[in-house]
Amino acid sequence: MFRALPFTATVHPYAITAPRLVVKMSAIATKNTRVESLEVKPPAHPTYDLKGVMQLALSEDAGNLGDVTCKATIPVDMESDAHFLAKEDGIIAGIALAEMIFAEVDPSLKVEWYVNDGDKVHKGLKFGKVQGNAYNIVIAERVVLNFMQRMSGIATLTKEMADAAHPAYILETRKTAPGLRLVDKWAVLIGGGKNHRMGLFDMVMIKDNHISAAGGVGKALKSVDQYLEQNKLQIGVEVETRTIAEVREVLEYASQTKTSLTRIMLDNMVVPLSNGDIDVSMLKEAVELINGRFDTEASGNVTLETVHKIGQTGVTYISSGALTHSVKALDISLKIDTELALEVGRRTKRA
């Protein structure tokens, strides 16, 4: 089946349509790439330019001369198929973004998928193909794979962590690759996780440095409540706590004052033991103290091996920077159908 995404694209400067001209990229970028029909939509962001990110990735690859290897080796009129191949098991992600990139390079390329974002693939599975001008397929190949491999790696780890963390929800953090914040967080959603704050703008998060500068947890919370009221802002507020005493201080403040606080972070309350196990007694005590008055978030010493035990403490969320800051890319490839390419080459007397 052929499934195309509904968004507008024009012939990209990197694409080859007739003569091999090197054309520089347009400075015009569209922030609102159409994503309404996607099964898993990218998270909202007021300034993130997804089209611009795609264009930057293509531009840094093409440089000022374009693909000199393709120009030297691939006939400009050669048509071919190329198949996506999973080279290991995992969760596939980035299918929607791949279609956008192919359309950015050459809107005439036809992309067909046999899986959806979030589906499991196994080693050796051909999970999609692209048909059209061979030159333009190869131009898009590396950029498409760079995004898909990273996103699929994030989605694969997220799926494993989310399943193990149940009934708690797994979150990523702001520890994303620079410039890829939305893409990384999109992959987390595809993998079955939930998003933490997108940036510094959409949630107040009072951490240790803020608490130290304000003179304590209570004073920091009071300052935040005053700021939000004065500026008529309605956004979530989270405060970091590191000890049971700090949890008690937060709860005491909340019992005496109307507050915008929505979540309490329980940081490093998971203690590693010498035998490789973890002690979650402090975390469990904190969750019981809070007793559902606020959402809770466990942070620190979260791994695939520890997340299940953490999730059994009753905590609402578990956050892990490892989902995005040091993820292993999923090994996938895109290979041109050699026999078809040779057949076309023979017909055009170029093989």
Curated annotation (Swiss-Prot):
Binding-site positions, substrate: R142, T173, R174, K175, R197, K207, E240, D267, S299, G300, N301, S320, G321, A322
InterPro entries assigned to the protein according to its UniProt record, in alphabetical order: Aldolase_TIM (IPR013785), NadC (IPR004393), NadC/ModD (IPR027277), Nicotinate_pribotase-like_C (IPR036068), Quinolinate_PRibosylTase_N_sf (IPR037128), Quinolinate_PRibosylTrfase_C (IPR002638), Quinolinate_PRibosylTrfase_N (IPR022412)
Pathway(s) where this gene product acts: Alkaloid biosynthesis; nicotine biosynthesis; Cofactor biosynthesis; NAD(+) biosynthesis; nicotinate D-ribonucleotide from quinolinate: step 1/1
GO annotation, biological process: alkaloid metabolic process; NAD biosynthetic process; nicotine biosynthetic process; quinolinate catabolic process; response to jasmonic acid; response to wounding
GO MF term list: nicotinate-nucleotide diphosphorylase (carboxylating) activity
Catalytic activity as recorded in UniProt: nicotinate beta-D-ribonucleotide + CO2 + diphosphate = quinolinate + 5-phospho-alpha-D-ribose 1-diphosphate + 2 H(+)
Keyword terms of this UniProt record: Alkaloid metabolism, Glycosyltransferase, Mitochondrion, Pyridine nucleotide biosynthesis, Transferase, Transit peptide
SUPFAM superfamilies reported in the protein's UniProt record: Nicotinate/Quinolinate PRTase C-terminal domain-like, Nicotinate/Quinolinate PRTase N-terminal domain-like
Induction: Triggered by wounding and jasmonic acid (MeJA).
Top-rank EC class of the record's enzyme: transferase
Tissue spec: Expressed in roots and flowers.
EC id: 2.4.2.19
One cellular component term from this protein's GO annotations in UniProt: mitochondrion
Intracellular or extracellular location(s): Mitochondrion
Disulfide bonds: none
Family: Belongs to the NadC/ModD family.
PANTHER family per record: NICOTINATE-NUCLEOTIDE PYROPHOSPHORYLASE [CARBOXYLATING] (PTHR32179:SF3)
Annotated function: Involved in the biosynthesis of pyridine alkaloid natural products, leading mainly to the production of anabasine, anatabine, nicotine and nornicotine, effective deterrents against herbivores with antiparasitic and pesticide properties (neurotoxins); nornicotine serves as the precursor in the synthesis of the carcinogen compound N'-nitrosonornicotine (NNN). Involved in the catabolism of quinolinic acid (QA).
Protein name per the record: Quinolinate phosphoribosyltransferase [decarboxylating] 2a, mitochondrial
Organism of this sequence: Nicotiana tabacum (Common tobacco)
Lineage: Eukaryota, Viridiplantae, Streptophyta, Embryophyta, Tracheophyta
